[in-house]
UniProtKB/Swiss-Prot annotation:
Mitochondrial membrane ATP synthase (F(1)F(0) ATP synthase or Complex V) produces ATP from ADP in the presence of a proton gradient across the membrane which is generated by electron transport complexes of the respiratory chain. F-type ATPases consist of two structural domains, F(1) - containing the extramembraneous catalytic core and F(0) - containing the membrane proton channel, linked together by a central stalk and a peripheral stalk. During catalysis, ATP synthesis in the catalytic domain of F(1) is coupled via a rotary mechanism of the central stalk subunits to proton translocation. It comes from Rattus norvegicus (Rat). Keywords: Membrane, Mitochondrion, Transmembrane, Transmembrane helix. It is a single-pass membrane protein. Component of an ATP synthase complex composed of ATP5PB, ATP5MC1, ATP5F1E, ATP5PD, ATP5ME, ATP5PF, ATP5MF, MT-ATP6, MT-ATP8, ATP5F1A, ATP5F1B, ATP5F1D, ATP5F1C, ATP5PO, ATP5MG, ATP5MK and ATP5MPL. This is ATP synthase subunit ATP5MPL, mitochondrial. It is found in: Mitochondrion membrane. The keyword Nucleotide-binding does not apply. One of its GO terms (cellular component) is proton-transporting ATP synthase complex. The chain crosses the membrane at residues 15-36. Belongs to the small mitochondrial proteolipid family.
Amino acid sequence: MLQSFIKKVWVPMKPYYTQVYQEIWVGVGLMSLIVYKIRSADKRSKALKGCSPAHAHGHH
């Protein structure tokens, strides 16, 4: 009973869900990539600033 109901609902909805999820995953992947790039760039700039002891001492 429940399985036939699931099949009736899921089969027409399945392509829609998979397409939406693909777009979500692409978005998530792009966002994480952007965040990673920003963080690595931020670390690099902090490392450059940290070379001078005055900055490293006063910035915590």
